[in-house]
Amino acid sequence: MESKTYYLDKISNNLGYPVYFLFDEIHVIENTNNNIKEIIQVEPDYSKPDLKFTEYRNGFFATNYIIEVAKVPLLDVTTIEKLLQYCSSFKLYKRFFENNRLDLCDYLITKDIKLTRRSDKFILNRIKKLDKDSLMYIINHNDFFQIRWEVIFKFVVSNITNISSDTNNEIIDYLMTLINNFDYKIDYDEIIKHIMIDPRTLKIKNIELFAELVDINYMDILKQACFFGSTEIINYVLNKGIEYDFYELIKSDISITALKFFIDKGHYIDDTTINILVNPESKNINRLIRSLINQKILTQDLITKQLLETIIKTDIHSIEYLINDFDIINMVDLDEIMIEALRYNFTELIDWCINNGSDINRHMSFIMKECCPEIVSKFIELGAQVPNDVSCYNPELIEIYCMYDDCIPYLKTIIEKEFDTAENIIHNIIENRPHIQVLKYLLSEITNHDLTIPKLANMFIHDYCYCSSENYGDLISLNIQFNIEQQIIIQIIEGNFINAKELIFTNYDCYNNLKILFVTMMSNNIDMLEFLLEINNYDQDYLQWVLIFSSRNVTMLEYIINNTNIDPNLFKQEMSTFSSHFKSYSVDYLKLNDYYEGTSILINSRLDIFMKNIGINIFKSYDNQRRL
């Protein structure tokens, strides 16, 4: 152990005392970004009798005492040989170039340290802010690096953010002169193709740079310029007298900017042009239609049935842009538009269909089955008749939308039609944590004052765990008969531990109830925990759960380890996952004491199953659960 070399990663004081996190020399490069100039070499202080030192992950360690050995420079000749033992030459070259330490690159070259295989394909693009000096260094030493000259050319042409335009031209001129001095046949076609794929590189100066070296297909450049909307390049190509077919250019996914350029040049836009532009294969029809309208290119005389059919079938939302500016009512099937508008909840389009005579009763079966309750309520308010057919009732809609109080009119209809009962709906939606007003309404429809909702405990637990207490007071004041389990949970949440103990003591079935245990552990109350341990002292399965649930709180965890015979080494994965889910500081404790084993418990493990049963997804982050 002592023969290894360790470096300080970070210090945590979350436990009230420092915990030092270290990594070994194998992980130096991967665990330090390229801006870090030096790291601190340390070793555990073996003189301390209460020293703890664990490897919680391969090559990563936690300890409570360290001795600083030395500050180790990462940009120094003295450390290169050691770094090369554990990382690729590519990573070292990258680090040295980013810090402009060309002297260290010289050292690597002197030692004949080649780039790792295939690194030539991406080293230039992986170096952040590669400056002129570093780039020229690579060019002048390319007999050693063996990067393809085409790769270097493409990088220089593209790299307009870090290197000025004048410098780019200077480097390209230098490259061409350099290459002409030795026997290398460069593939300029590859470079031209690269220039064409990016609007930042498709520039006149770049085209002219290679025009004398290779036959350029100006028609390909024209089509690409039309796609990018580069009017400067379009004008440049047209001035060369290139003949073109306007319709063929339009088929090349022409941008609105380029289209406007050609209109200004005298090209006439007819319905053929529009139908070529707007076709089932068109990319982003929504944006295209908006642009055609905003640029005054699309006019009433260009609106045809064929165009409207294409839009309806490919992007119904785009019809919304047309109804405000054009008269299309006699060219469309209102029922077809209504169905699509309902399917995607496009309210403006729905209103337009209704205002233009669409029969509000015709689609009620579809609406009841497929649409959100807000739409259903809207149609009912307009006088639509809900069919007396229970098959048009879709209970899943309520489960989806019960978190919003605008579904109450929909619920009233369901209950009045006797498609379902308020009591049954409550039982079906309770785990989805419905809006408090939805619960209040449903309870007002129930005459059974002895109603119990077993799964309501999960709502209490979820709100308690994730600080979502805004509905809690309303929940416990509702007209509900709480069962014993729920009463105990309420007492624990409200801090009435004496009442909770009395209820548990008089109800034997609740002694080893895991929901009650879970809430107790979340309360961090040692006295309540001691009570539960006393009455379950011989229940090994229960004590195992106590250990797992305690792992989010160091005080509780230490208490359980010291006062039970459960071996924490047998439950490392469960404790690691549980504490990590709640973003608990106890993760540091687990790592320091060799109880940490990552967060990779299996789906459908017993912890996963229990947490799902109380409405918590252990695999989702704590913050995401809070937003539910």
UniProtKB/Swiss-Prot annotation:
ANK repeats lie at residues 217-246, 333-362, 421-451, 512-542. Keywords: ANK repeat, Repeat. InterPro entries: Ankyrin_rpt, Ankyrin_rpt-contain_sf. This is Putative ankyrin repeat protein L769. It comes from Acanthamoeba polyphaga mimivirus.
